[in-house]
Design a protein with these regions (language model features):
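NAD(P)+-binding Rossmann beta1-loop-alpha1 motif at the extreme N-terminus of oxidoreductases
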Residues: 1-60, 66-71
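NAD(P)-dependent Rossmann-like dehydrogenase/reductase catalytic/cofactor-binding core
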Residues: 7, 198, 205-209, 234-305
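Conserved active-site and cofactor/substrate-binding residues in soluble primary-metabolism enzymes
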Residues: 14, 18, 22, 42, ...
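Rossmann-like NAD(P)(H) cofactor-binding subdomain of soluble oxidoreductases
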Residues: 63, 70-78, 82-155, 171
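Internal alpha-helical scaffold of NAD(P)-dependent oxidoreductase catalytic cores
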Residues: 91, 102, 130-134, 155-242
């Protein structure tokens, strides 16, 4: 079946966290109305009543005429041409569990930087296999960026990834604003794995900071992380790619250094002496690096890396 991705294509976002909220804000600046699947009753009530997400980025106020929050997943997906997944990777299956509407005529975009636990598949791989979609109708939107700065109109760069460059350009138009600049890539595999690996590296940086290591050591740790990322991609999926550009290295740097980095924050708590369990309980947002670490170990074994 044919999918629609051009100017007239309608967008919907699945998820209600900080990144999902920031993405809806970008889309609402360009689109007449954005579908939004919100399964949390408190968040849904806040969006419908006040145009605010009371749990994440609560200072962001939406024009309620431009958003269509709903707890009916089928309705949201049915009315959309482009479906953007913006849930934590560990909860993607449960978010999509109620779905009975076919995705065959949809263009699906992953804004998730993680691996589906237990399946040991990236989001793109999982969507491809589970919903029988071609890789041509799956895209990625990634950083380097944090939701907090995007939502406040800070100059940011996003990377749009599709196997078809024309699709990437059309998808990018949905997100472009005067403060959002876009770069494009066809490296679906490389960009997605780079976004996964950088969360693990940021966790290690947080641990190092928590243990009292300084900038000298962090420079070595992050530089070697960048090298390991490049080698992983070369071994697992050889292709011509420049891992020094923003979609790879830039995303790694912002996640390792930013005060907004939840993965760095989790590592910091562990470095300060918290148990992993207590550190996770203290986090108000999901740190993807925690789930990704074990998944990458299995993937390394699969590829014999």
């Amino acid at each position: 079946m044919e999918y629609k991705i051009g100017k007239e294509a309608r967008c919907a976002v699945i998820g209600y966290g900080s990144w999902a909220t920031a993405i809806v804000g970008l889309l609402a600046a360009n689109e007449a109305r954005v579908g939004w699947y919100v399964r949390n009753p408190e968040v849904l009530e806040g969006l419908l009543g006040e145009g605010r997400n009371p749990r994440y980025l609560s200072d962001v106020e939406f024009d309620r005429r431009r958003i269509a929050p709903s707890d009916d997943l089928d309705e949201v997906v049915r009315e959309a041409d482009i479906v953007i997944l913006a849930t934590p990777s560990a909860y993607l299956k449960t978010f999509l569990e109620p779905l009975t509407v076919s995705l065959q005529d949809k263009f699906v975009v992953s804004a998730i930087k993680g691996i589906v636990p237990g399946d040991y598949k990236t989001i793109v791989e999982y969507v491809h296999d589970r919903y029988d979609l071609s890789y041509k109708q799956i895209g990625i939107i990634t950083g380097p960026s944090h939701a907090e700065e995007v939502s406040r109109g800070k100059l940011s760069y996003l990377t749009v990834v599709c196997t078809d460059p024309e699709n990437a350009q059309m998808l990018g138009e949905k997100f472009a604003t005067d403060y959002i600049h876009l770069s494009y890539s066809t490296d679906l595999y490389g960009i997605e794995y780079a976004a996964i690996l950088k969360n693990i590296y940021a966790l290690s940086v947080g641990i190092a900071v928590g243990l009292g290591y300084g900038d000298n050591f962090l420079a070595v740790l992050i530089a070697n992380s960048a090298g390991e990322m490049r080698r992983f991609l070369e071994e697992s999926y050889p292709a011509e790619r420049d891992t020094l550009v923003s979609g790879y290295l830039g995303d790694l740097l912002v996640t390792c250094y930013s005060v907004y980095s939840r993965n760095r924050r989790l590592g910091l708590l562990i470095g300060h002496g918290c148990t992993v369990k207590s550190a996770l309980n203290e986090m108000t947002m999901v740190a993807e690096g925690y789930f990704a670490a074990d998944c990458i170990r299995h993937i390394n074994a699969r590829h014999k890396i």
